[in-house]
Amino acid sequence: GVVEELLFDLVADVGRYPEFLPWCRAARIRSKTDTLLVADVVIGFKGITEKFTSRVTLDRPNGIIRTAYEDGPFKYLNNHWVFEPHPDGCLIDFYVDFEFRSKMLQKIIEVFFNEAVRRMVGAFEARAHELYGPK
C-alpha cells in the first residue's frame, strides 16, 4: 500500500539521514540503482566519530531493506527493515545487531544502546509525520 511505500522510501533515503537522525553527522551515496546503494555514513556519539560503508539492498516488491556492512569500525553489522501492511497503516520490523572492533567503543555503546535505538526510531517516526502527516 501507499503507507508502506512512503515509509520504505523514507528509510531508503540514506543521503538525508543527517537531516533528522541523531548521531548521523554525514552520509554520502557512492552508487545507487533501484535495488542497491552503497553509502558512507559518519556517526558521532559522546565525542567519538566513526565512518562506515554499507551496501543497502532495496527489495521493494517484498518491502525489505537489508544493510550489509562493508568497511569501518565494526566487526560486523547486520540490519534489516521489513514493511508490512496493517489496518492502522504499516507494521515495521526493525532489526540491528553489531559489534565494534574496539572493546572500549563496544562497552560505551552497550550502556546507551536501548536509548539510542529508541531515539533513532523516534526520529524516523517524527520524520514520517513531518513529511506525510500524522497517519
Language model region names:
Residues 1-34, 88, 123, 134:
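Hydrophobic ligand-binding cavity/cleft-lining segments
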Residues 26, 53, 78-80:
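Conserved beta-strand residues within beta-sheet cores
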